[in-house]
C-alpha cells in the first residue's frame, strides 16, 4: 500500500475524537520539555543513576525529574532498579519498548536536519511581520 501525505492526514484525523486521539497520546508519552531529554540520556548512556540524570538533564528540578521518570516507568519505556543500600542506590535504563523508539527519534532528527533552516526562515519572517 502506498501511503501519501493525504492518506496520513486522513488516518490521523479519523482516529482522533474528543476523548481519544492515539497520536496525541503517543506524543504525551514521549514529548514535553523533559521526557525527550531523559530518554535520549538513557538511550545513549545505558544505565544511569538518578543524580547523574539530574546533572545531565540541565535545569530540571528533582521533583520534575522524579515525576517524569515515574510517568516513563508507568508507560513501560524505562526500568527503575532499586538497590537496598545506605544511601539508596537507584538506577534507570531503557526497556525494550523504550529502545523501540530509536527509529522514531532518528526519523525526527533527520527531519530536523533537513528542515531546520526553513524553520528558522519562517520564524524570522513571522517575527519580522510582528514588528
Model-derived features with residue positions:
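Glycine-centered, phosphate/nucleic-acid-interacting loop/turn motifs that mediate DNA/RNA or nucleotide
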Residues: 76
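Recognition helices and adjacent regulatory flanks at domain boundaries
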Residues: 1, 5-19
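Exposed, interaction-prone assembly regions rather than primary DNA-binding/catalytic cores
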Residues: 121-131
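Hydrophobic alpha-helical core bundles mediating ligand binding, dimerization, or RNAP-core interactions
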Residues: 23, 27, 102-112, 116-119, ...
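N-terminal helix-turn-helix DNA-binding core of bacterial DNA-binding proteins
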Residues: 17-64, 84, 91
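Basic, amphipathic "hinge/linker" alpha-helix immediately C-terminal to the N-terminal HTH DNA-binding motif
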Residues: 84-107
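Basic amphipathic alpha-helical segments that dock to polyanions
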Residues: 65, 69-72
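Short beta-strand "wing" residues that participate in macromolecule-binding interfaces
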Residues: 80
Amino acid at each position: 500500500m502506498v501511503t501519501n501525505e493525504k492518506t496520513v492526514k486522513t488516518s490521523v484525523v479519523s482516529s482522533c475524537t474528543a476523548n481519544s486521539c492515539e497520536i496525541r497520546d503517543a506524543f504525551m508519552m514521549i514529548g514535553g520539555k523533559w521526557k525527550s531529554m531523559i530518554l535520549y540520556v538513557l538511550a545513549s548512556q545505558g544505565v544511569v543513576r538518578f543524580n547523574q540524570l539530574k546533572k545531565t538533564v540541565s535545569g530540571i528540578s528533582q521533583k520534575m525529574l522524579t515525576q517524569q521518570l515515574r510517568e516513563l516507568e508507568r508507560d513501560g519505556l524505562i526500568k527503575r532498579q532499586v538497590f537496598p543500600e545506605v544511601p539508596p542506590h537507584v538506577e534507570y535504563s531503557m526497556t525494550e519498548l523504550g529502545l523501540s523508539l530509536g527509529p522514531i527519534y532518528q526519523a525526527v532528527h533527520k527531519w530536523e536536519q533537513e528542515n531546520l533552516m526553513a524553520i528558522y526562515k519562517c520564524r524570522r519572517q513571522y517575527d519580522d511581520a510582528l514588528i
